């Protein structure tokens, strides 16, 4: 099973992990809806919906760049309608867009709290709700419908909350969407899963966090390859929904034990661990 001719609606796909997932799918000849906010280049965060579209086309896919703020319900509904008008439907939703602030309660103003929850938890829920009618059609037509959310396994351990309670709440909100929607959408034949990296991933956003050694990170392509495995699995198989995958575990389970090619620094074995993975 591959992604040729499938349409993927990917949020936050103008750069980083979202773009890597888009390009991996494009290599099969997929249609990619690039739903992201950045339409003009910013030297601090290179990449726009238009530059991403060029990369997707160069990789072998079709691209529809759409400027979308996933906090805006009407903007999301309009983007879904445009995707359907352009490609005839939506087979896969990838909830990748996310906001982060690693601040404690005293240093997290409500504006920042609302931003994280608006993008992470609410945005994931909204995009899933908006795409659901098309995903149901795709599943009914045997097109292997999937929802994949880039969020961590749920853990109630205090050390994952205390340093950045607001961020954890927002990120776990995405994971709770996976938990609930996997059960809710099972009857439609739509698989719903989460995927999370074991290590820090070298993205432009990560490099803006002070003190991060990018040389001790892995590349976004490890998540792209792991996502591909999820999205090409049989959505109607009960074992393939409701999972909280860790990238290297999933790859190893599919026989990909040598992960050195994903290291920013080849040969490195000491990576920065990501949040929420014990």
List where the protein language model places each region.
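Conserved glycine-rich Rossmann-like NAD(P)H-binding loop of the short-chain dehydrogenase/reductase
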Residues: 28-51
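Conserved glycine-rich cofactor-binding loop
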Residues: 14-15
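The beta1-alpha1 cofactor-binding region of Rossmann-like NAD(H)/NADP(H)-dependent oxidoreductases
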Residues: 47, 67-79, 110
């Amino acid at each position: 099973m591959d992604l040729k001719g499938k349409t993927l609606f990917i949020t936050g796909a103008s750069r980083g992990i979202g773009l890597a997932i888009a390009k991996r799918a494009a290599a099969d000849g997929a249609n990619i809806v690039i739903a992201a906010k950045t339409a003009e280049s910013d030297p601090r965060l290179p990449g726009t919906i238009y530059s991403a579209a060029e990369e997707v086309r160069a990789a072998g896919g079709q691209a529809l760049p759409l400027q979308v703020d996933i906090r805006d319900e009407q903007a999301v509904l309009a983007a879904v309608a445009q995707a359907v008008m352009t490609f005839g439907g939506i087979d896969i939703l990838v909830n990748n867009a996310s906001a982060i602030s690693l601040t404690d309660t005293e240093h997290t103003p409500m504006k920042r709290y609302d931003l994280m929850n608006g993008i992470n938890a609410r945005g994931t829920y909204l995009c899933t709700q908006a795409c659901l009618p098309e995903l149901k059609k795709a599943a009914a037509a045997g097109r292997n419908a999937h929802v994949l959310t880039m969020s961590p396994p749920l853990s109630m351990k205090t050390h994952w909350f205390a340093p950045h309670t607001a961020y954890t709440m927002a990120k776990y909100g995405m994971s709770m969407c996976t938990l609930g929607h996997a059960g809710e959408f099972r009857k439609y034949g739509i698989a719903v899963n989460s995927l999370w990296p074991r290590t820090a991933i070298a993205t432009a956003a990560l490099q803006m966090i002070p003190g991060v050694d990018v040389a001790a990170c892995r590349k976004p392509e490890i998540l792209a390859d792991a996502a591909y495995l999820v999205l090409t699995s049989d959505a109607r198989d009960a074992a393939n929904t409701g999972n909280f995958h860790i990238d290297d575990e999933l790859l190893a389970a599919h026989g990909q034990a040598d992960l050195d090619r994903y290291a920013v620094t080849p040969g490195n074995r000491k990576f920065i661990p990501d949040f929420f993975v014990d």
